[in-house]
């Protein structure tokens, strides 16, 4: 095997791991929603969309054989992860400052009118308020865990893009 083949195989493993991590995080969100009765707010649903996008892009990139296609999809993953970091940070700010609000009355109709909310209402319909603080897991609030997840994904993908930047030219 040459260096190119080894590098692309390593990259595929990373991308498959990212995809499966996103599936696990979404499964955890559904567990909290249906078993623990922790209703998702508009910002929670937006974060779910970002995790879905990251997972889809990761699985697509894992199936591509050329570096340029992988690079484009990894760039899309980085953009989605950055959006997730921003959304989770905003959500965490709202929960840590009791007087703040996510603007439920303006965000909820927008999020609920998106097509996936019509196709999969059990996963993408808003049912809670952003200000509602649920019990922390290991001392960290749910938006904090989401922020950590998005940040780790962003760092991993940006590091991968940086590591393989020369493969695009050659």
Curated annotation (Swiss-Prot):
- Please give an example of a GO cellular component term from this record: plasma membrane
Q: Does the keyword Ribosomal protein apply?
A: no
Q: Where are the disulfide bridges? A: 41-44, 102-130
Top-level taxon of origin: Bacteria
MF GO annotations: electron transfer activity; protein-disulfide reductase activity
Q: Name one Pfam family in it.
A: DsbB
Q: Which InterPro entries match?
A: DiS_bond_form_DsbB/BdbC, Disulphide_bond_form_DsbB, DsbB, DsbB-like_sf
Keyword Ion transport assigned to the entry: answer is no
The entry's localization annotation reads: Cell inner membrane
| GO BP term, example | protein folding
Q: Where are the transmembrane segments?
A: 15-31, 50-64, 72-89, 145-163
| Side Cytoplasmic, residues | 1-14, 65-71, 164-170
Keywords from the UniProt entry: Cell inner membrane, Cell membrane, Chaperone, Disulfide bond, Electron transport, Membrane, Oxidoreductase, Redox-active center, Transmembrane, Transmembrane helix, Transport
Membrane topology, as annotated, equals: Multi-pass membrane protein
Membrane side Periplasmic: residue ranges: 32-49, 90-144
Q: Which family is this protein grouped under? A: Belongs to the DsbB family.
Q: What does this protein do?
A: Required for disulfide bond formation in some periplasmic proteins. Acts by oxidizing the DsbA protein.
Q: HAMAP family from the xrefs? A: DsbB
Name of the protein in its database record: Disulfide bond formation protein B 1
Organismal lineage: Bacteria, Pseudomonadati, Pseudomonadota, Betaproteobacteria, Burkholderiales
């Amino acid at each position: 095997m040459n260096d190119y083949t080894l590098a692309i195989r390593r990259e595929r493993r990373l991308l498959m791991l990212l995809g499966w991590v996103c599936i696990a995080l979404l499964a955890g969100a559904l567990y909290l929603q249906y078993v623990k009765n922790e209703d998702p707010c508009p910002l929670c649903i937006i974060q779910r969309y970002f995790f879905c996008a990251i997972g889809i892009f990761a699985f697509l990139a894992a199936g591509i054989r050329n570096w340029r296609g992988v690079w484009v999809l990894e760039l899309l993953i980085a953009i989605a992860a950055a959006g997730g970091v921003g959304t989770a940070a905003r959500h965490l700010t709202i929960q840590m400052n009791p007087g703040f609000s996510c603007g439920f009355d303006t965000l909820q109709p927008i999020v609920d009118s998106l097509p996936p909310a019509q196709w999969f209402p059990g996963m993408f319909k808003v049912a809670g308020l952003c200000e509602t603080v649920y019990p922390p897991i290991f001392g960290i609030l749910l938006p904090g865990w989401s922020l950590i997840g998005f940040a780790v994904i962003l760092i991993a993908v940006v590091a991968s893009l940086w590591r393989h930047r020369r493969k695009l030219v050659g």
